[in-house]
Regions:
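Basic, Lys/Arg-enriched alpha-helical interface segments
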Residues: 1-101, 110-114, 121-147
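Hydrophobic/aromatic beta-strand elements that line small-molecule binding cavities or substrate pockets
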Residues: 104-105
Length: 147
């Protein structure tokens, strides 16, 4: 399972991020406690998928994908991989190359899916308020039915 997930997430073409958000019900049957899906805007954009595609390093994408996979299979999971931020929003914490740190903010929806709301490279110790507010806004939109 790991090899298939990794190849579809990173593969040779970083624009083919299809390992997340495809057939979540089938993935739950394969042992995932909370299959990850991308939050989708009204316009059809997927902010986390777009952010991942824009990362310059395939090693960064691989590390983030591994940590998301760890949460999918190990939920509920705590530090150092995952931390609650309040209001039902959590962060996946990933150490990247060149001593950088990324965060992918998510929540668990009523269907038991890990909805990836927002991703960013951390530049300060504290999670920036604007990033947390954006994730909360995306969560509200998703809960209102904007998938």
């Amino acid at each position: 399972m790991y090899r298939i997930w990794y190849i579809t997430l990173v593969g040779k073409n970083p624009k083919s991020l299809t390992g997340i958000g495809t057939q979540p019900e089938a993935l739950q049957r394969q042992g995932k406690h909370v299959p990850a899906i991308f939050f989708r805007t009204e316009a059809g954009g997927e902010p986390v998928r777009d952010w991942l595609r824009g990362l310059p390093s395939s090693e960064d994408r691989k590390r983030i994908g591994e940590d998301i996979k760890t949460v999918e299979f190990g939920w509920p999971i705590g530090m150092p991989v995952c931390r609650p931020l309040g209001d039902g929003v959590y962060e996946v914490r990933t150490s990247l190359v060149q001593n950088r740190i990324s965060r992918v903010l998510f929540y668990i929806d009523k269907k038991g899916r890990m909805v990836l709301l927002h991703g960013f490279i951390k530049k300060t110790q504290k999670t920036p308020d604007e990033d947390l507010e954006l994730a909360r806004s995306n969560k509200s939109k998703h809960q209102r039915g904007l998938k």
